[in-house]
Amino acid sequence: MTSKEFGKILQDKLTSEYGVELNVASNQQIYRSLALICRQMMSENHKKFQSKAIGTGTKQVYYLCMEFLMGRSLKMSLFNLGLDEVAKKALADADINLDSIFEEEPDAGLGNGGLGRLAACYLDGMATTDICGTGYSILYEYGIFKQKIVDGWQQERADNWLPGGQVWLKSHPDQAVEIRFDGEIHENWDNGFHYIQHTNYNSVMAIPSDMYVQGYDGKGVAKLRLWQAKAPDFDMSSFSLGNYNTAMSKNANAELISKVLYPNDNHVEGKILRLRQQYFLSAASIGDIVQNHLSSYATLENLPDKVAIQLNDTHPTLAIPEMMRILLDECGFDWDKAFSICQKVFSYTNHTVMAEALEKWNVDIFKMTLPRIYQIVVEMDRRAREELAKAFPGDQGKIDYMALIGDNQVRMANICAYTANSINGVSKLHSEIIKESVFHDYYLFKPNAFKNVTNGIAYRRWLLASNPGLCKLLDETIGDGYKHDASDLTKLNKYADDKTVLKKLNEIKLTNKKDFASYLAKSTGQVIDPNSIFDCQVKRMHEYKRQHLNALNIAAQYLYLKENPNADFIPKTYIFGAKAAPGYYMAKQMIRMICKLGDLINNDPAVRDKLRVVYLEEYCVSLSEHLMPAAEVSEQISLAGTEASGTGNLKFMLNGAITLGTLDGANVEIADAAGKENELIFGMLTPEVNNLKRVGYHPNAFIMGDDVANSALNFLERGWNGENFHEVTENLRSSDPYMVMADFKDYRRAQADLQKLYADRETWARMSLKNIANSGIFSADRAVLDYARDIWYASPVPMGK
């Protein structure tokens, strides 16, 4: 397609939608028109793709996740459709900058952190590799929240993303699914058949809206189906009798389910709402999957041959008993046959090594909210206990630990582990840890079910669409094969000693840093020096991710520079970006500490030219697309054995940042791929952490003999300008659950090594090159094909050339 032809399509859309000419259209009108053009093209491509899949009997993959962190869609849709250059030219001919149009789109408010971003990357990977994939989630009206930092404190504001994001969604009210909550269950037997009657229930309708993800330069398209909660009908009788509040409350209560991602569950009402959300997602999705399958095959007997359902974390666990409910109550299968089908179609990805993070629901809340599902889980638990008793005779403690219900709680992870045909971790280390600790007993019970698929990222978004300068260098050195196959990046290794290439790499990074500094100044007013080291830690704010370890070192560096103003110190800009869960008080204290430390340092003329701290408010996908190409140091500093994998670390690596991190999660594989000498590794190893926990960890043992640690803690404890951070420091001095103080000294050593290495620009560029060259293994394409081969047993749709 030529730019002229594209310009005509755009003008036709502007005329039909808004009745305006391109030269007078607003940026918002142009954005919406471009989105509609892309949506229509992707919808047509998806119909062809699905038709081919059904016609050839290709296995369908369904990916259930509570969140999909999609970011913006316009830029990547144009890019993957191969229309980015013609769109840019068509708009330039009308004196319009395409980048300014991209800024009109809000980030889709459907996710929070790595879990949701991984799900979004895998939709991209499925589309690109021609795996017939559908994602399922909830159409959150307000998403997670918009973060506002006021006087150092995080404030949560409604993220009203739908007015700008709705254009990507196509609603299908005719495909709504009824979801039933509460009520009573009545069981009857008639001529050997078991009948279930559910009475006095509350209905909620799940209305689907679809958005599409186009595969890169191909014919594959993935669909993301999002469910919106609506009351089944308006209570006109109550309204007519003057009971306005009753009539309206039914609507409001139903629609609460799809208002906000992860409502605060520090109270009973929040817990019930979360449970209702999870069942709503699970039941709507399973109902849709069953209906789709029946429309193609008219039987569920062959469901395992034609369908694979991936549960991404424990949030969609209730899909398992819901599938059982449909097979038993609506389709007349006996228990053994129904459970056999479930065992074959469901697989589960675990995302945490911390047992306390595995979801459990109070039995009374569960039974009241989901009475029929509770009955099914009780029967699953009874049968599981019988089976486990045969596997582990006499070991009642093990059976109780592995049971689906115990200690008055319904255990989501155990439902998954008992039922799923595959249980996978998301990095090699994580997959070993879950076999050794969290799911050790289940590993003994069904060892062949445990697998590993290391996380992958949609690398084209983070490289091809975000870092054109680096792509130009890659095209000139290794050709453009890497755009289709990320493993081609390894060809860059042969340039590791090419001084010209290394010099160009440094120049590209400096240009990207200048671009980011300019973007930051324009969007926030914050001024940073592009010639300083850009040291970045952007991820959820959480104690286990140890942003307070980073902050403690910044405090120590500040004190050092105050005492040694003429010290040889390469200027450094520390960049943070993170949201804290609304009910997570300590994480909010950590944000306040970092922000206040930044205010102090950035306003101190004695140090601000050598040290700066930037907190990126409302960190999101589109902001990260600006940051990743500019980053030089990737802080991945979780306590060894606590991070499952990570995805930010992979994006940083792809763009040439050096990992400053522990050997945790995917950092282990990053160091293996690029060479440990090309990262800055510090801290205890997982066995050392476990041993220290076993003998008893006392943070003061590490603080007492360390003057730097003592000074930094005292400084933060005393505070300044009437502010102090004793709650954070007291936590570090007393319990320190993530062993910040045990790793602090070695972390400082790694930071000192960083300064020395960075001073040798050629050495630093070589380290950067080795990271770029060996990052291809972490592509979502590779990860999806691993899942397809080892877990889903799914083949690509044979689309032909």
Segment roles from a protein language model:
Residues 1-801:
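A conserved ligand/cofactor-binding region detector
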